[in-house]
């Protein structure tokens, strides 16, 4: 494999959720450890599952992976990092300043952007700790899905320039002291990321057009900010031998080969490896060792036709239940890459076909909704909350209102404050709350961003709710977006997942997070299931067999109601293909 040749000290894996970054980064770490290298595997993903892959509680201190001599691992927990970050700033001023001032500073440091910057603080510490490179030959980062990774990797430049030019900033991060000390570290982190002798970036993708387009955007964006040493790994490719068995396998193989032959510009020039689809899920050291191994394409697997025949678990049945309320907010949540965009579009089309007025909207940074829905339908409105546009609109609004009575120095200070990366979080949230107000009169179907973003969005919603409640006190009736999200008569949250171990685990974790926020998911959609797709391919049958325990777990342990959606022979783009998902 090209990926495994002349590996520099730092290796980053990035890509959409569900493409196999964790599996490949873990397999690479095992490979290097078996070559006698000392390896540290670091996860900075809010939806981290490295511990689950190795069946080991890892946590945020370096610990050896007992099953693999030479390998150690570390997980950065963003929430814990934020707590420690707050304590570092707030503890020294307790008792020195009035309680209300201390509480105000603590509150300023409780938002989503603090969590992100705190996790990044730890990330920077690892990149700039010279002693780590005396203990380890390689440090491998299993980073978060694409949108989050881009923001994470853009932060060092954004924050170091912001701190440089804004020593007295009124940023929502509160006092800049917590960052001021690390200014040099941020600069060194940027330097390390941009140095091809020290850092290699591995883009991980599956052979699906939307995934490849997203990876191409990531490639361009990261190359622009200096990360030019990039490799591409295409994971989960169906072996040609499987295409002989039936129409579905042949269609999947054909579709993947066409995608491989027509890689987006930029990707085709990168050093590229392809990994074949595995018959088992990548959990445990022995399975991971097989992932990078060279082997024959033809798998001697038993030919059994697995067809899951449960009671009515169709997507159309789920939508018919939703339609009874005649209006409301439908939010699809889940990890990136599970098909939220497609499911949201299919649900919106079904409701519009039933005669309802529907507004379909997305805040997904990848924004491939327009690709999925290329055709128009009466009584269906499609819109996108564009993070860049919303941020600009928000900045202008703040400058025109808060900035109206400021002198020139004050205006300059406010402008600088609005250049803080956390401004985008606030702007996107405001746009989101504008859209959900419409749900009293029609159906609003919202395709939310991948897991990490979704949790940040909900955190912002909760902070807004607390602010309104504080201002209103006990007087009067009021409704905040958070109250609407918590009301099952007005909001139906659907969790979308895939019938695989890790996606189900992550969706269950997301459900637990939602329930802590007082939101109980109305149902689950299990997408891309082979177990209800009629196939005689030995490999696909083996994969279908692997799905059954996961489907049963969702049904019996997690969900009030579920829908099962099969793998289709062609990608569901366009209205007719979306209608097929309902049959």
Swiss-Prot record:
SUPFAM superfamilies documented for this protein: P-loop containing nucleoside triphosphate hydrolases
Keywords from the named record: Arsenical resistance, ATP-binding, Nucleotide-binding, Plasmid, Translocase
GO molecular function annotations of the record: ATP binding; ATP hydrolysis activity; ATPase-coupled arsenite transmembrane transporter activity
Organism name: Acidiphilium multivorum (strain DSM 11245 / JCM 8867 / NBRC 100883 / AIU 301)
Source domain of life: Bacteria
Reactions catalysed according to its record: arsenite(in) + ATP + H2O = arsenite(out) + ADP + phosphate + H(+)
Coiled-coil spans in chain: none
Enzyme Commission no: 7.3.2.7
Function (record text): Anion-transporting ATPase. Catalyzes the extrusion of the oxyanions arsenite, antimonite and arsenate. Maintenance of a low intracellular concentration of oxyanion produces resistance to the toxic agents.
Entry protein name: Arsenical pump-driving ATPase
Xref: Pfam families: ArsA_ATPase (PF02374)
InterPro entries: Anion-transp_ATPase-like_dom, Ars_ATPase, ATPase_ArsA/GET3, P-loop_NTPase
Record-listed ATP binding positions: 15-22, 334-341
PANTHER family documented for this protein: ARSENICAL PUMP-DRIVING ATPASE ARSENITE-TRANSLOCATING ATPASE, ATPASE GET3
Family according to the record: Belongs to the arsA ATPase family.
């Amino acid at each position: 494999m090209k990926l495994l040749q002349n590996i520099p000290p730092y290796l980053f894996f990035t890509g959409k959720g569900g493409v196999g970054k964790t599996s490949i980064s873990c397999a690479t770490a095992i490979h290097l450890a078996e070559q006698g290298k000392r390896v540290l595997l670091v996860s900075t993903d809010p939806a981290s599952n490295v511990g689950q892959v190795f069946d080991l509680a890892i946590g945020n201190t370096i610990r050896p992976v007992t099953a693999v001599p030479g390998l150690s691992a570390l997980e950065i927990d963003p929430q814990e990092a934020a707590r420690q970050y707050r304590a570092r700033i707030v503890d020294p001023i307790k008792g020195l300043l009035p309680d209300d001032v201390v509480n105000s500073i603590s509150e300023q440091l409780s938002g989503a952007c603090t969590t992100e910057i705190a996790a990044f603080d730890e990330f920077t510490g690892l990149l700039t700790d010279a002693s780590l490179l005396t203990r380890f030959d390689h440090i491998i980062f299993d980073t978060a899905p694409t949108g989050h990774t881009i923001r994470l990797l853009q932060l060092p430049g954004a924050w170091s320039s912001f701190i440089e030019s804004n020593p007295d900033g009124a940023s929502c991060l509160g006092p800049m002291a917590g960052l001021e000390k690390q200014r040099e570290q941020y600069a060194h982190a940027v330097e390390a990321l941009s140095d091809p002798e020290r850092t290699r970036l591995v883009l991980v993708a599956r052979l699906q057009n939307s995934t490849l387009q997203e990876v191409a955007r990531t490639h361009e964006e990261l190359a622009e900010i200096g990360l030019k040493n990039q490799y591409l790994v295409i994971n989960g490719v169906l072996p040609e031998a499987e295409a002989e068995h039936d129409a579905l396998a042949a269609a999947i193989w054909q579709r993947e080969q066409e995608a491989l032959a027509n890689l987006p510009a930029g990707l085709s020039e990168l050093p590229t490896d392809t990994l074949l689809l595995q018959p088992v899920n990548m959990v445990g050291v022995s399975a991971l060792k097989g992932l990078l191994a060279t082997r024959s394409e033809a798998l001697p697997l038993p030919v059994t036709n697995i067809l899951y025949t449960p009671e009515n678990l169709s997507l159309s049945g789920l939508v018919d239940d939703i339609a009874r309320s005649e209006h409301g907010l439908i939010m699809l949540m889940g990890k990136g890459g599970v098909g939220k965009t497609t499911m949201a579009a299919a649900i919106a089309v079904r409701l519009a076909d039933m005669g309802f007025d529907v507004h379909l909207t997305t805040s997904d940074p990848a924004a491939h909704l327009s690709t999925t829905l290329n055709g128009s339908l009466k009584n269906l409105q499609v819109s996108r909350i564009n993070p860049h546009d919303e941020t600009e609109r928000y900045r202008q609004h703040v400058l025109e209102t808060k900035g109206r009575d400021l002198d020139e120095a004050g205006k300059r200070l406010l402008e600088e404050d609005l250049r803080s990366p956390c401004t985008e979080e606030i702007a996107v949230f405001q746009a989101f709350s504008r859209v959900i107000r419409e749900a009293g009169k029609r159906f609003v179907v919202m395709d939310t961003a991948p897991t990490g973003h979704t949790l940040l969005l909900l955190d912002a919603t909760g902070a807004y709710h607390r602010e309104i409640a504080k201002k209103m006190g006990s007087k009067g009736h009021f409704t905040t977006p958070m109250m609407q999200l918590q009301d099952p008569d007005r909001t139906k949250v659907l969790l979308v997942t895939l019938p695989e171990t890790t996606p189900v685990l992550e969706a269950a974790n997301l459900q637990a997070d939602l329930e802590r926020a007082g939101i109980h998911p109305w149902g689950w959609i299990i997408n891309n299931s082979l177990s209800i797709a009629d196939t005689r391919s030995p490999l696909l049958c083996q994969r279908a067999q692997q799905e059954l325990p996961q489907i049963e777990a969702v049904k019996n342990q997690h969900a009030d109601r579920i829908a099962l959606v099969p793998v289709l022979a062609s990608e569901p783009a366009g209205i007719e293909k979306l209608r097929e998902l309902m049959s």
